[in-house]
A protein has these predicted regions:
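Short Gly/Thr/Asp-enriched flexible loops that form oxyanion-binding sites at enzyme active sites
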Residues: 57-70, 74-78
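Gly/Ser/Thr-rich loops at beta-strand to alpha-helix junctions
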Residues: 51-57, 98-99
Length: 164
């Protein structure tokens, strides 16, 4: 059901959706975040849609993975601002928190806003100087993240050693 929603929205915004499925029964959200990292770092995908019960554990786990910048949101404005301003490559959504009547439609609206944000220029109604300052701040954050983390290959090796 959720993947059908993702596919519909992706197609509406000229993107392709693929499901990165796992058959292991013993994986947790940390394992899923690592697999997301593999997919992005190996250029299998250019954006990840993910989530968990609250969405926050998945976001945190993804943000520990080198080269992943994962946002979180439950509203259209949060999704759009994350995509257009923070320019991350992953987005986490809560699939149990407040999930109920019409939740699938709310998720659809959030995804539309997210995909629209991926194609929007950041800060369309803000003076050019302010836009440049905010884009520079986003780039600074990305540079700091790269500096603070080991490269993905070393990270993956550490992960394998922890799992074994």
């Amino acid at each position: 059901m959720l993947f059908n929603i993702i596919q519909d929205v992706a197609i509406a915004h000229d993107h392709t959706a693929i499901a990165l499925t796992m058959t292991e029964q013993t994986v947790d959200y940390i394992d899923v975040a690592i697999r997301c990292g593999y997919a992005l770092n190996e250029k299998e995908v250019d954006f990840i849609l993910t989530g968990c019960s609250s969405g926050l554990g998945m976001q945190l786990a993804c943000n520990y993975v080198p080269n992943l910048i994962c946002g979180y949101g439950t509203s259209e404005i949060e999704a759009n601002l994350f995509a257009s301003i923070n320019q991350g490559n992953a987005f986490s959504y809560p699939f149990s928190l407040n999930w109920g009547w019409a939740s699938e439609e709310k998720y659809r609206f959030v995804l539309h806003a997210l995909f629209k944000g991926l194609n929007d220029l950041p800060y369309p109604k803000v003076p050019k100087e302010e836009v440049q300052r905010k884009i520079a701040a986003t780039e600074k954050l990305k540079d700091l993240k790269k500096t603070a983390q080991i490269d993905f290959e070393a990270f993956a090796e550490v992960y394998q050693n922890i799992r074994n």
